[in-house]
Amino acid sequence: MSEDFKLDATARNDLGKGASRRLRRLADQVPAIIYGGSKAPVNVSVSHNELLKHLQHEAFFSHVIDLNIDGTSESVILKDVQRHPSKAQVLHLDFLRVDKNTKLHKQVPLHFINEATSVGVKTQGGKVVHNLTQLDVTCLPQDLPEFIEVDLAAIEAGQILHISDLKLPKGVISTDLTKGADHDLAVVTILKAKGGESEEAAE
């Protein structure tokens, strides 16, 4: 993990929909809840402006966050973000506590590289189809990757890459593959050019 994310939070006792609306409107704060582990859930609020800065980084969604709650630090991951349907406004956050000795499950984005220069596209005129854009992984918090790279340089038209074909970082495993071979999903396909086009991979 190459980035460190820190976010300040304030514990709150004034709960309910009305309190949350006032918090967002008058204090420019976002209501949130922290849960998980052996501790009781805690209701907090965070700065909306500060949060928006972090949300601009893809890694914020797949990274352990240092959440400072009134001077007490908690290691958490972002589990859910509720956004306003028409405004650039975050309505609520869910944070999950993590323990450095306990494995966690998290979706990590896939980064596809060398698409345009791959054998299947540049030489054979194929078309890339992304079957997955994120991968469910299981690992310790300190091993959680910001993203997983998928190199298409040597992939030919008509070829399908599955989860089992990916090179995962040390300490990281695919959650799907732990369920059996039937869950070895297609990740990316290069369709053949028209006239010799292959079928898209089914999950």
From Swiss-Prot:
Belongs to the bacterial ribosomal protein bL25 family. CTC subfamily. One of its GO terms (cellular component) is cytosolic large ribosomal subunit. One of its GO terms (molecular function) is 5S rRNA binding. The gene is rplY. This is one of the proteins that binds to the 5S RNA in the ribosome where it forms part of the central protuberance. InterPro entries: Rbsml_bL25/Gln-tRNA_synth_N (IPR020056), Ribosomal_bL25/Gln-tRNA_synth (IPR011035), Ribosomal_bL25_b-dom (IPR020057), Ribosomal_bL25_C (IPR037121), Ribosomal_bL25_long (IPR001021), Ribosomal_bL25_short (IPR020055), Ribosomal_L25_dom (IPR029751), Ribosomal_uL5_bac-type (IPR020930). It holds the Pfam family Ribosomal_TL5_C. CDD domains: Ribosomal_L25_TL5_CTC (cd00495). Keywords: Ribonucleoprotein, Ribosomal protein, RNA-binding, rRNA-binding. The keyword Heme does not apply. GO terms for biological process: translation. The keyword RNA-binding applies. This is Large ribosomal subunit protein bL25. Part of the 50S ribosomal subunit; part of the 5S rRNA/L5/L18/L25 subcomplex. Contacts the 5S rRNA. Binds to the 5S rRNA independently of L5 and L18. HAMAP family: Ribosomal_bL25, Ribosomal_bL25_CTC.
